[in-house]
Amino acid sequence: MMLAGKKMGNKLRANGNFNKTLISKLTDNIHEAMMMTSSLEEARMETKTLLYSSKKKNAMSHMTLKKLIEEHGTSSVAGLVSRENLIEAAFSMFPKSQIGGPREILIQSYKLRSHVRFFESLCEGLCMMHPKEMLTKGNKKENIQSSTSSSFKNELIYNKEKKRMMSLMPAIVADASRWAPSFTMMMFSYFLISLGLPSEIEDHCLAVLKAFSAKLIQLPDSLVEKWDNKSSLEIEAEEELQWLRENTMITRFVHRVMSGMGQGMLHRFSSLIHVAKDDILDELITMYLKQKNVDIKMVTMISSDDLLKQMLISGHNLKDMFESLVDILSIYEVTNMLSNIHTNWKKTSLSFNFNEFNSYFSTGKRATMA
């Protein structure tokens, strides 16, 4: 992570827009955070940033942040966070139904929202400078996916007819499993420090990560009511739920989580880490295949935990080219391990026919949404 952060920092600072991006994000306002549906305003937990209430209260984000703006007299994100002396990562939770089982959704406290907005806005600016990062590319990503496939196909034909070289067009399609829970704030901190950001920005970002290393989560009301009406001697059918019950502040129904970024919270920061890790992967693959007299071109698309790496592998020995595919997957898995990324091979494929990224399936210029 430190190597990836160092290389990423050097690459970003070499970009002529680096200082302009920092200035732009430091002068950003809080208005975009107001578009979020709701924020936690009161909770059944003892904190210094939220009012205590016997029942949690979620309020519309634009109303809670309006109060914060009136309190501090500024709508500048940097101005708001500089006037807060304490960052507490407090959340409420509710389950969201989806295919494959419900996903937990965390609602940030309204004061935390301004700090996360500052951090994520900065990371968004850095992501925009990296060609692999797709959260910031909008509707351009579909064109990148299709045009890359067509370009590689044309080059494959050219290599065969003009250079008498054989070529393969594989693609790694991956959706990481246990992405959010796997990361620790210590690991994030190493990466952040290695980026070499100005000390004032770095200090605040580290404070946000420190707060996230001890998140306070108010459990859903339905679960609270269930345990209120259930004897403490009665064991839960699911082992994970029983563990949660035993390790929760039972009088407040608050659980303290010591790791993980929080589902969808540090979205752009995790995407920045992923592209930095992938840059290291590309360097290792290119150096290794050069020793085997195999040429490779790669175009990678990344959005947080999703990845599509389209490749054009060319050479004169077909056996060496197929063997290199096994080596590429091995290097991919090892770099994932070194970055604490769990590779779920049920959701990872080496494809020769179809490419998929964010539910957009394509083969050449033909494509469809799932």
Per-segment meaning from a language model:
Residues 1-370:
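Viral RNA-dependent RNA polymerase
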